[in-house]
């Protein structure tokens, strides 16, 4: 079962550093985990990808992230409303509310390097493949927010003796 897919605005390949890097990640913000559990399959330059698209390099597959969803709200009225007014505490690693959208990433070094080398802009498509749900979950709209995909590259310099 598949929910509605998300495709990003084009990202300029010229703005992405892919040469001489040790790792490239695609980061996603505002991923909702209040509903169904799902695998987020990530494809580059394949906005038509769906749950039946083979996850391979030829189809632009970059990797997957996995969300263990809460399955909907089972508490009293107001229980599932996220308190956006709670002050941020840099010494408290917990989310301010269990239903606060999460940030996640996919290690996609080879896929991004391969796609960026073609010189065209890059679109990021996330295909949510539903793996678990309850009657209270909206399985069509598991991706409720703009995911703000960001391509991040890392350079590691290792000194040898």
Task: Place the predicted regions along the sequence by residue.
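Intrinsically disordered, flexible peripheral segments
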Residues: 1-161
